[in-house]
Amino acid sequence: MLKICRLQFIHSRNFIHRDLKPSNIVMGLGKHTNFAYIIDFGLSKEFWDPCTCRHIPYNNTFGLIGSATFSSIHSHLGMEHGRWDDLESLAYILIYFLCGSLPWQGLYFEGHDLVAESKQ
């Protein structure tokens, strides 16, 4: 639940992360050990244009953005990221934490197309 609240905060600031994966979620220290923090905003992007007060226009990115294992199906298909894609990545992370692995993890080295097919 805490990770969803953190992601909601990022989205409320008009940003999408675009590279959610377990190594980008860290736990606090000392009295903050119960808090999860999302880090590494190197691939993040604004999804809301403050000048026009509109969502950014749809573009095909023509390439995978982020980690293939935890990225959304849209990312595998080269589509523009949105808030939904961050939520899909978070769902994969939660499944990974619960089960210890994802069904498509071994397919990563064989190509992104197989990973995308497995997710669909």
Language-model features: locations:
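Short C-lobe core helix of eukaryotic-like protein kinase catalytic domains
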Residues: 1-12
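Intrinsically disordered, low-complexity regions enriched in proline, serine, glycine
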Residues: 19-20, 37, 47-49, 103-107
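Conserved C-lobe activation region of Hanks-type protein kinase-like domains
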Residues: 30, 73-120
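Activation segment/activation loop of eukaryotic-type protein kinase catalytic domains
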Residues: 28-65
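Catalytic-loop of the protein kinase fold
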Residues: 11-29
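Protein kinase subdomain VIII
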Residues: 52-54, 64-79
